[in-house]
Design a protein with these regions (language model features):
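Protein kinase catalytic-loop region centered on the HRD/HxD motif
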Residues: 146-159
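ATP-binding glycine-rich loop module of kinase domains
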Residues: 27, 35-88
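Active-site beta-strand termini and strand-to-loop segments that position acidic
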Residues: 65-69, 117-118, 170-172
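Hydrophobic residue at the +6 position relative to the catalytic HRD Asp in the kinase catalytic loop
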Residues: 164-170
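Juxta-kinase regulatory segment immediately upstream of eukaryotic protein kinase catalytic domains
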Residues: 1-52, 239-245
């Protein structure tokens, strides 16, 4: 059973000021977490940091599980060596994605921390390797395509879906969730759907697993996406699902 500790527990110092301890950074993170209503942290996850644990680690932040009241949340915490001065822009993009029906629910954000829904599940490739039922795979693919189209139509580019292994989680109910809006932008050209189609159906490590459940013609898919690039329209989802026989 995972251990739950108060924010001030000494074991969390290595997490709240990772990778290099700075008392100023630690106190700033601690203050932001308190302002978000976080009182406890769950020592759970696959990554060890001293005597604590994380569920994720990136170039600018680390992620652990916290508690706001009786709700478990994912806490994204700015690293002490981060090149980004604040996580607030990422939180703003996540909030926008939420308005499109995409991403883990945002609960709050400060300069050094984001509190959001904790998505329990596996990344898309690992989930496929677990040999789910074909119908579940088909539903997940439709879900992913639909979410990417929604982001395109509403003007937010995720920025990292051409290499989406770490950015698409399939939860315990088989529903897809796109995560990590650190590189997202509302000003550049939207490429979510074209990026994820390239990742799913043209990247060999993913497509060989999908091919056990779905059939497609690469030339036809390429032509469909060329048409979409020339004239972005929601109609593309019907065309894609028809070709992939996902209806």
């Amino acid at each position: 059973m995972a251990v739950v500790v108060p924010l001030e527990d000494r074991r969390l110092k290595a997490v709240l000021s990772y990778p290099h301890f700075s008392n100023a950074h630690y106190e700033a993170v601690l203050g932001d977490l308190r302002a978000l209503g976080v009182e406890w942290v769950v020592l759970a996850g696959g990554l060890e940091v001293g005597d604590a644990r994380l569920i994720g680690k990136g170039c600018t932040s680390v992620v652990c599980i916290g508690m706001i009241g009786d709700r478990q949340v994912a806490l994204k915490i700015r690293r002490s060596d981060s090149s980004r001065e604040s996580l607030e822009a990422e939180a703003s993009n996540l909030e926008f994605a939420n308005s499109c029906g995409v991403g883990p629910r945002l609960f709050g954000a400060r300069k050094n921390a984001i509190a959001m829904e904790h998505i329990r599940g596996q990344n898309f490739v690992r989930w496929l390797e677990g040999k789910p039922h074909t119908e579940a795979v088909r539903r997940a693919v439709v879900d992913i395509l639909g979410q990417c189209l929604s982001l395109d139509m509403n003007g937010l580019d995720h920025g990292e879906l051409s290499e989406a292994k770490k950015h698409i989680i399939i939860n315990e109910d088989g529903k897809a969730c796109i995560i990590d809006f650190e590189s997202a932008s509302r000003s550049r050209k939207r490429r979510n759907l074209t990026s994820v189609v390239s990742y799913l159906f043209f990247k060999e490590s993913v497509s060989r697993l999908l091919a056990m459940h779905i059939n497609w013609d690469k030339k036809v898919l390429t032509d469909i996406m060329k048409g979409y690039k020339a004239d972005p329209s929601e109609r593309v989802l019907v065309t894609l699902t028809s070709h992939l026989k996902l209806y």
